[in-house]
């Protein structure tokens, strides 16, 4: 029988921005003694990880009773409530709607840039110029929009919600893609990102190439 008081197991990789969201929540909430982090071997034929999570995706959280939670939003929500003092949960009402709206917008940026980066890692003859062009254009539109949205009160403070956490994770994907030049012409977004970038939770979870 599993001990309900034993740590939950969080399966991650050190490259996934989605896993990074969960890793940041663990550090921000000081849950290190409640969460065992395990490096998963993904995108490998017959990886033992597929017996744990058939989809092979991260993050994946295994609860003491064996329940499996997948998808970063669900995993982060569970972790946020693990100490019974949720910090990242959107509030009720109009303010909560704003948080969810901006989180969705930040997630669109992160997902698109992630696809763009994956194309760059493919062999040259397997890359899709159409996908690269599409995701690059999407990123340009979203970054232009974020230059004004970053002034929204929801985006102020120090990683107080998932909209902020998701956006900075997306912006810091710049280190993997030299063509993701979002800093050019977006001074408010640059100031916002640079102000938060020295937080311990971000420094300790910098993706490892």
What are these model-derived regions, one by one?
Residues 1-129:
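GST-like domain detector, emphasizing the conserved glutathione-binding G-site
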Residues 27, 176, 198:
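Short polybasic/polar patches that bind polyanions
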Residues 29, 186, 199-200:
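Acidic-histidine catalytic/liganding microenvironments
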Residues 74, 188, 201:
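Residue-level recognition of oxygen-bearing side chains
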Residues 76, 80, 100-103, 143, ...:
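Non-transmembrane alpha-helical segments in soluble domains
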Residues 86-91, 155-158, 184, 203-208:
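Short, hydrophobic secondary-structure boundary micro-motifs
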Residues 106-194:
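GST-like fold's C-terminal all-alpha helical module
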Residues 148-150, 196-209:
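Charged/polar, low-hydrophobicity segments characteristic of intrinsically disordered regions
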């Amino acid at each position: 029988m599993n001990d309900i008081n034993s740590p939950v197991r969080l399966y991650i990789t050190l490259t996934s921005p989605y896993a990074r969201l969960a890793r940041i929540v663990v550090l921000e909430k000081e849950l290190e003694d409640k969460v065992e982090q395990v490096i998963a071997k993904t995108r490998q034929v017959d990886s033992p990880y597929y017996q744990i999570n058939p989809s092979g995706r991260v993050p994946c959280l295994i609860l003491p009773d064996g329940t499996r939670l997948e998808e970063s939003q669900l995993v982060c929500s569970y972790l946020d409530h693990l100490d019974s003092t949720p910090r990242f949960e959107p509030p009720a009402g109009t303010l909560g709607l704003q948080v969810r709206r901006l989180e969705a917008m930040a997630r669109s940026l992160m997902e698109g840039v992630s696809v763009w980066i994956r194309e760059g890692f493919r062999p040259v003859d397997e890359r899709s110029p159409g996908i690269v062009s599409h995701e690059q254009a999407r990123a340009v539109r979203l970054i232009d929009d974020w230059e004004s949205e970053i002034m929204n009160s929801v985006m102020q403070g120090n990683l107080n919600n998932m909209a902020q956490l998701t956006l900075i994770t997306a912006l810091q994907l710049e280190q993997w893609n030299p063509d993701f030049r979002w800093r050019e012409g977006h001074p408010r977004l640059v100031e916002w990102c640079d102000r938060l970038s020295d937080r311990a939770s971000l420094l300790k979870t910098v993706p490892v190439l």
